[in-house]
């Protein structure tokens, strides 16, 4: 049975929070997001913020991208990026370590849309089938992305057609991820 994206994302996020609480005794923390406003922040430490996910309000979609590029985006990407505000979360899948990208605030949502447009424009210019990034890796040139045509999640090399299947659906990808703490 295929979980819907909202359920799969909530489940992964809860596993990530549980890991933080088991290993550190507190909610997820970020030094990188210190000083950046967000509805997720529940406490501020000396040089870090502690966060927990918040509902994405007001409701939103990525239709601005669709209008700007005259493209229909895979429905899973709308659900993935508009369910919650949260910090980025680290996870492993097989031999790969990912930083699952999340929306931190309304301003971050605008930035995300601009970056997705840039990504899609680059792919169109290079005559590559469209993908939408979901997670980064330690390499600036490799990322996990949703194939806009098939809905598969692939490991792709930026700017090339080199793609490796990671999961048949986004919900399967989220379900298979194993949360890890940042090093």
UniProtKB/Swiss-Prot annotation:
Q: Where is the signal peptide?
A: none
| Record flagged with keyword Metal-binding | no
Localization: Cell inner membrane
Presence of the UniProt keyword Lipid metabolism in the record:
no
Q: Which GO terms describe its cellular component?
A: cytoplasmic side of plasma membrane
UniProt membrane topology term: Peripheral membrane protein
* Family indicated by similarity: Belongs to the Syd family.
Role description: Interacts with the SecY protein in vivo. May bind preferentially to an uncomplexed state of SecY, thus functioning either as a chelating agent for excess SecY in the cell or as a regulatory factor that negatively controls the translocase function.
- Put simply, this protein is called Protein Syd
Species in which this protein is naturally found: Yersinia pseudotuberculosis serotype O:1b (strain IP 31758)
**Native organism taxonomy:** Bacteria, Pseudomonadati, Pseudomonadota, Gammaproteobacteria, Enterobacterales
């Amino acid at each position: 049975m295929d979980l819907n994206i909202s359920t799969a994302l909530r489940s992964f996020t809860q596993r990530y929070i549980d890991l933080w609480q088991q290993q550190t005794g507190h909610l997820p923390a970020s030094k990188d997001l210190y000083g950046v406003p967000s509805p997720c922040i529940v406490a501020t430490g000396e040089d870090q913020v502690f966060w927990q996910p918040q509902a994405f309000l007001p409701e939103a979609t990525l239709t601005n991208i669709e209008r700007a590029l005259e493209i229909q985006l895979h429905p899973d990407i709308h659900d993935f990026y508009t369910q919650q505000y949260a910090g980025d979360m680290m996870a492993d899948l097989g031999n790969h370590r990912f930083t699952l990208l999340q929306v931190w605030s309304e301003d971050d949502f605008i930035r995300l849309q601009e970056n997705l447009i840039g990504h899609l424009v680059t792919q169109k210019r290079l005559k590559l089938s469209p993908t939408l990034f979901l997670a980064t890796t330690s390499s600036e040139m490799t990322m996990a992305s949703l194939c806009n045509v098939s809905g598969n999640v692939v490991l792709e090399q930026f700017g090339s057609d080199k793609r490796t299947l990671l999961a048949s659906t986004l919900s399967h990808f989220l379900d298979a991820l194993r949360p890890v703490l940042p090093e």
